[in-house]
Design a protein with these regions (language model features):
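Gram-negative outer-membrane beta-barrel domains
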Residues: 2-275
Length: 275
């Protein structure tokens, strides 16, 4: 019996020694920390993209400051002319876009979070012009006179470059990574504005219509203005082969200092490489 026990102990020790000498086949064991069958998204990545965008630009009241500058402070016409300028409405612009992106992902099991810099180029040009028929006001103003007022008001915004710095979070499902993102939006725009105000006044309605006009012109132009705002959106990526992946996403951008209320929606597709 003693010999049998000793023989079994020796055999077990030999087997353990052989197992310790065998190589660790990492590919068979799988990466530590990731679910079986889930792609490893951790690390740096870069890529290119192209898409189609739609911009909505609301120019209502966008020339109010220029009107006040043209008329001067405390002018009795300011409120009336600015109300006419409110006829500036919304302009829709559609454009193709292209650009690139770079970022870094961290991964815990199936959860992926990261930060990304994204750039898009596309000409979003919007122009609004208001030129109503001169209006004769049937009640006198605070100066005791009747006024006939005309206005030509124009404003143009051209956005050519957009960039976003965004945080994103996703959940890996097999070879796919659906995600959401949000962050800071930056852009560059050329903005031009002009107004021409005409005023005729008299002691009666007919006199104001027949009087010689007085003109108040003003214009302004800003080239390469830095825009800022915010972005949000959703997307998904799919690992194709090796470390090459494809992506599709929708992005919303709103600029708050573009000389108009600017909202841009883009849909895009791209290819990237994870290092």
């Amino acid at each position: 019996m003693r010999r049998l026990v000793v023989a079994m102990m020796v055999a077990g020790a030999v087997q353990a020694a052989r197992a310790a000498d065998m190589p660790d086949y990492y590919a068979l064991r799988g990466p530590v920390g990731y679910s079986s069958g889930v792609v490893n998204w951790q690390g740096f990545y870069v890529g290119g993209q192209a898409g189609y965008g739609s911009a909505d630009m609301n120019f209502s009241g966008s020339n109010n400051a220029l009107i006040a500058s043209a008329l001067g402070p405390n002018n009795i016409l300011i409120d009336v002319v600015q109300s006419v300028s409110g006829a500036h409405g919304k302009v829709g612009v559609h454009q193709t876009t292209y650009g690139g992106f770079a970022g870094y992902n961290s991964q815990w099991d199936d959860v992926v979070v990261g930060i990304e810099a994204n750039y898009m180029h596309g000409k979003f040009n919007g122009t609004s012009i208001v030129a109503p028929v001169p209006l004769t006001y049937v009640t006198p103003f605070s100066d005791g006179l009747y006024h006939t007022i005309g206005l030509i008001s124009g404003r143009s915004v051209s956005i050519s470059d957009m960039g976003t710095i965004r945080a994103r979070a996703g959940y890996a499902v097999g070879s796919f990574l659906p995600y959401v993102f949000g962050g800071l939006a930056l852009g560059r725009a050329d903005i031009t504005s002009s107004v021409l105000i005409m005023d005729k006044s008299g002691n009666s309605i007919s006199a104001s219509q027949a009087a010689s006009p007085q003109y108040y012109p003003a214009s302004d132009s800003i080239g390469g203005k830095m825009l800022y705002g915010y972005t949000a959106g959703i997307g998904t990526e799919a690992m194709l082969f090796g470390n090459v992946f494809a992506r599709a996403e929708w992005e919303y951008v709103r600029f708050v200092n573009a000389g108009a209320d600017v909202n841009i929606n883009t849909v895009r597709g791209g290819l990237g490489y994870k290092f």
